[in-house]
Amino acid sequence: MLRSDAVTKGIQRSPNRAMLRAVGFGDSDFGKPILGIANGYSTITPCNIGLNDLAKRAEEAARQAGGMPQMFGTITVSDGISMGTEGMKYSLVSREVIADAIETACNGQSMDGVLAVGGCDKNMPGAMLAMARMNIPSVFVYGGTIKPGKLGGCDLTVVSAFEAVGQLTSGKIDEVQLTAVEKNACPGAGSCGGMFTANTMSAAIETMGLSLPYSSTMAAEDEEKADSAARSAEVLVEAVKANIRPLDLLTKEAFENAISVIMAVGGSTNAVLHLLAIARTAGVDLSIDDFERIRQRVPVICDLKPSGRYVTVDLHNAGGIPQVMKLLLDAGLLHSDCRTVEGKSLKELLADVPSEPPAGQEVIRPLSNPLYAKGHLAILKGNLASEGSVAKISGVKTPVLTGPARVFESEEDCLAAILDKKIQAGDVVVVRNEGPVGGPGMREMLAPTSAIVGQGLGDKVALITDGRFSGGTYGLVVGHVAPEAAVGGTIGLVQEGDSITVDADQLLLQLNVDQAELDRRRAGWSKPEPRYRSGILGKYARLVSSSSRGATTDHAD
């Protein structure tokens, strides 16, 4: 019995079949599984510009494997293009829109399974949220990573262009050099090339078994990526037959495996937010504290940008995520019995993967010689973040900083101050009212952090925010501060010049103001007026949960 029988079987469904005949169904097709192809193709961004070819390959393969594919579109927002603008407020919102769209199309048409094709950052968690909500057989196809740009013998990514802006304002480069970086940073199709958010989330999905082995690190423009899309469709047909569903795979152990891999590869802070959201939707008891627990035992073994030397295609050439997983598995750092969409256990999947990283490469290190002995995503708490905050500490030379607060009510005000050279070594920059409710939309702060790095202050200044950071951010940065300012969090009580301690060693984020003074400030605090009362941002601000619970919109806190 298929779910799609609800629209294809029986005399009463003759009108339904009439419409299906108009889109290509014949007599022999009724009774085949109807498979949604959720296509994120868009010319908005290089991340998604190649997705149509992958979706068509998957569509063809699904039909040849005995399914009836039905393609439909979903949206994307380009984080890189909207970064530093009001448009960035729509980025995290788009995760919910993508999830809602896929759920609506698949459930509205009684589809038997779904293959989602995505590229830019929110495509991955958006698709995963939909898959967890629907719990129908599902496979994710990642659009692939962009190849590195080249300039003067150096690899470039889009983050190189953001940092070049700071280098220009500090006099390190001129406009000719800035333009050269701009023209060479993004050479073609694919998602941003370091271990930024898109590649982090695709690695997590591969680890959790909802995409195929090696698929998360393939280059977008290589033929093996198209072949992988076709194979993914074949696997989906088999998953429908075997009734393998997302909630069979998305167990607590699978999430722990994903966190372990994210730590090992040096992945994005956004993975914390997205995995919390997916777990909540899947009914899995995952908390922000689980990330810290796993961080303590899993080292960083991949030397990847933004803080390292290499890009994701280099990781692929060194063995990809399966090689990383095999090293962790052999060390007892992964749950070996987790299943994949192909019906295999993780142990079975990795049986033929070498137990040592390939010789002659420095992208993946052995666990005996890690880049960092512990994971790089630290969970900081204190009176500034009673529900927690997320710090990315890989490559940080100064993990402890106590300094005066420089308070900004928006990203724009902060960036202007940095570019005007008003931020000095030792400052603790506070950007607030950028959280899920306050922004709304929890913008990423890549422009300010890149400007700080570009001016040579990356190891000398801390930045904390109730907003987010791009996967391309590095330095002493602390995001996802919860509770956020807009709902009464302590970050909203900070005043210019207050002493703040950021201590990544002791996992502390503390406002050094006595409790009596904090109580006085809190008594005088009033909830700010919403920045938007209508439209999708107004709706989002009314519905969204705390970042410490994934910033979802379909669960009441």
From Swiss-Prot:
Residues given in the record as [2Fe-2S] cluster binding sites: 47, 120, 192
Positions in coiled-coil regions: none
EC annotation from Swiss-Prot or TrEMBL: 4.2.1.9
Pathway(s) the chain acts in: Amino-acid biosynthesis; L-isoleucine biosynthesis; L-isoleucine from 2-oxobutanoate: step 3/4; Amino-acid biosynthesis; L-valine biosynthesis; L-valine from pyruvate: step 3/4
Cofactor field: [2Fe-2S] cluster; Mg(2+)
Residues found modified as N6-carboxylysine: 122
InterPro entries: DHAD_IlvD/Edd, Dihydro-acid_dehy_C, DihydroxyA_deHydtase, DiOHA_6PGluconate_deHydtase_CS, ILV_EDD_C, ILV_EDD_N, IlvD/EDD_N
HAMAP family: IlvD
Similarity comment: Belongs to the IlvD/Edd family.
UniProt-recorded name of the protein: Dihydroxy-acid dehydratase
